[in-house]
Amino acid sequence: MAADSDPESEVFEITDFTTASEWERFISRVEEVLNDWKLIGSRVGKPLEKGEYTSGTWEESSQEISFADFKFSITHHYLKQESAENDGRDELEEDAYPLAMQDLLCINNDFPPRAHCLVRWFGVREFVVISPGANCEAIISESKCSLLLSSVSIALANTGCQVPLFVQIQQKHRKMFSGECQGPGVRSDFEMVHLRRVPSQYNHLSGLLDIFKNKIGCPLTPLPPINISIRFTYVLQDWQQCSWPQQPPDFDALLAGEVGGVEFGKLPFGACEDPISELHLAATWPSLTEGIVVDNDVYSDLDPLQAPHWSVRVRTAENPQCLLGEFLTEFFKICCRKETTEEILGRSTAEEEGKENSDITQALSKLTEPSTAVPIHKLSVSSMVHSARKRIRRHRRVPESPLNNDVLNSILLYLFPDAALDKADVSEVRPPQQSPDRQSEDYHLYNQLKSCPSDSLTHRLALCICMVNFHHGGVRAVAHLWQEFVLEMRYRWENNCLIYGLASGPPDLRCCLLHQKLQMLNCCIERKKARDDGKKSSSSDGARDRSRGAPEGAGPEGAGPAEAAGKSWDSWSDSEDEFFECVSDTEEMKEDKEEAENRSRSKPEGRLQPHGTHTLLNTQEPLYIPITQEPAPMTEDLLEEQSEVLAKLGTSAEGAHLRARMQSACLLSDMESFKAANPGCTLLDFVRWYSPRDYVEEQVTDADGRVEVRGELSARMKIPGNMWVEAWETARATPARRQKRLFDDTKEAEKVLHYLALQKPSELTRHLLPCVLHAALLKIKEEESAEDLPSVRSSLQQISSSASKILRHPNPEFKKLEDVISQLMAVEAVIARARSLKAKFGVCGGEREREEDGDELERFVSSLLEEPEVCVSGAGRGPAGNVIHKLFVSSQRAALLAPMEEETLRSGGSDDRKAFPDFPPPAGREILLRTCVPRPAPYSKALPQRLFCVLMRDEFRLAGAFSSDTSFF
């Protein structure tokens, strides 16, 4: 009892009747969102202009809300307009209609071609939608629908929001909405009916008018006039009289070898199917009244030819198959493969190659054998490679080869047109390499994409690889062609044949790496060819000198063995050059330094031309510019490798010194050439010519008072341990032709050939992908120029810009490259659509009777490509309308199996019209009914009422907005 009497032990149960329920929390959350979006109070908007729903910008914002554990998405849709609040805020009336109610009666934006379905059905410019979340079930039961609508009504009343608020109910695919809009003393209810079949009594205008009148229940007599807008849509799918403009290339002829090699340089273009699948004609009768038009179950006045407004939209085929896009896609697929050439072509071929190449591995041992009976040229490495190459080719040309001989020969002839010339003239032929105009678009394009010039060998190779991959065997054909290409490169190197289609000079670092490698090989061939030509002339000079008893003939630049004196120079192989160089290098190493210097003093060598103004400071003899070695050309991978090596040397003094010595090879060579050309010269003479800024002149007064100009080295040249001073002291007077080569063309050529031989098909296609994209862009530009499509031009600029950024990366991402190819395919489809429409409307042919009609048709076709829906000038009586009418008549006759007679079509006989209607039954009918009546009582305010009706073969939809006066009800 004591415990019970303790006041602290007593417990009081408190019931909090203010606790909010889940329903109240949901309503509160809706109100918070409306406040966040500033949708509270009255809205002011500018009057809607005609077509603004289509041309204007629609924006939206969304948030997530919950009713207990059920997720909803609330979205605000609105047409972006300039604010009109400052202009009309002072003029607002206290009981003004909400903006949405005013939009119900606006006739400037009926049937917008591209808008939200609620905009089309109810004509509102701003609204809010509450819909179930992505993974939530639909609101189907009537109780849940009523609960949501009650929540909406309460939230609108509490906040004073005048923006209509909709709730999505039923299954999402049915697009069923119910909503409400509240204003001061007024309310509009948005209701909807959706059926699968059209009830027979409502399959015409008169039945729908009955529904509308019964729903609004106007007590006035007579009933205020009802504004009627009607749109019938007719679909054309059969293009009977229109020939498809795309002419596919004759691939059978190409396979049979009947098409010349030039065909390999052309990328295909165009759609394989008609990219225009349907044409939708909308015949519109705006702003009719009930007594003007008759449409019931017995008779209808609604003839599309008599409609005052026509508009057309085209439906395009989804992802049409296009030739260029298919080429690019199949080519890109090879980039993702990992097989080597041996794995693709099979081990048998590789084994045969290894068997035949055994001669190459024994080449060096054969060269060292003491046998004198074997001619020197039979023992050379190059001849071994050449003979093995011939045997490999013989083994490859079997019926199992991916490429047959005819196709392969056509490709090689296209790649190397100089091969068709007489063999005696091949080495003398220099292909005409036309450098692109620096102002041309092509020049800047290959610069941007890091590809290659469009007239180069690499460009042609990319096109051939692309074609054989698509038409002649896929990746196996690619591997086969690449092997043949590498063999051709080796043949040209061995035989001093310049590579056709490559610009002379060092590798162009603006191009792709493969193009640089081929340019490097061409440089090697040029150097080797020039050296061999120089030796040929030296040998003839040496022979003449020996006949005169001149001792200089026995030098390293002599003719060589006496038994070769009567031998043609063309019969010498590369092995003799290589062997001769080894001997000459050995003799040069044995040569005494002092003897060489004495000889250089007595006879200057390697002079190019006198300088003109400078003389040697000590001897006052003219200063001669020497013949120097050209610096070694390098590709970007070699430059990167060299920079990495130099960077690894570090920043220490020893590392810096070693780095300077590595970079001074060219300087030392130039010093030796300068000494040979200018006996008795000094370092000051060399610096004065080679680096004028390091030669400092100053005026000095001698003992006799005469002013002289004397020169000296700059301060940096006087630093102890200067690399220039060390190099000058070690440099010998040796002309460039007797120096050790800065650029070993034999070594570099073999490195390039080895690099090419190791390329997998996937690596090859990655190298050539910029060239293929470059060719595709040029092809699209060429095709677009004939069509004059501004949208395509702007798209091409964007594609070029994005592709250049991607391809500049050493390892571009495949996903981004796929996006570029997809964009090119989309542009190709646009051009194909333009050609299809021009063919259908007779723009390309000579069918148009008057020039002004042709111009109007061209503008009409261009608009169809750019806009979602295009108005037809003159409706059915204009130039475009006449063509559309003929298209439908032709389709109708074909559908009814009646032969088409052109004369009857032109005359349009009445009997024929009765038998065969010009248009099929409309695929869709849209009827819009509007009026303004007092509701619910005769003395209520006159408020807008609207009913939008959609009648299709498998759908019947009524979307109504019915307003009522709530002041006293």
From Swiss-Prot:
It comes from the Eukaryota. GO terms for molecular function: GTPase activator activity; guanyl-nucleotide exchange factor activity. Residues 573-589 have a biased composition (Acidic residues). Residues 532-549, 590-608 have a biased composition (Basic and acidic residues). Residues 550-572 have a biased composition (Low complexity). GO terms for biological process: brain development; positive regulation of autophagosome assembly. Keywords: Cytoplasm, Endoplasmic reticulum, Golgi apparatus, GTPase activation. Pfam families: Rab3-GAP_cat_C (PF19533), Rab3-GTPase_cat (PF13890). Residues 532-613 are annotated as: Disordered. It is found in: Cytoplasm; Endoplasmic reticulum; Golgi apparatus, cis-Golgi network. GO terms for cellular component: cis-Golgi network; endoplasmic reticulum. Belongs to the Rab3-GAP catalytic subunit family. Catalytic subunit of the Rab3 GTPase-activating (Rab3GAP) complex composed of rab3gap1 and rab3gap2, which has GTPase-activating protein (GAP) activity towards various Rab3 subfamily members (RAB3A, RAB3B, RAB3C and RAB3D), RAB5A and RAB43, and guanine nucleotide exchange factor (GEF) activity towards RAB18. As part of the Rab3GAP complex, acts as a GAP for Rab3 proteins by converting active RAB3-GTP to the inactive form RAB3-GDP. Rab3 proteins are involved in regulated exocytosis of neurotransmitters and hormones. The Rab3 GTPase-activating complex is a heterodimer composed of rab3gap1 and rab3gap2. The Rab3 GTPase-activating complex interacts with DMXL2. Interacts with LMAN1. This is Rab3 GTPase-activating protein catalytic subunit.
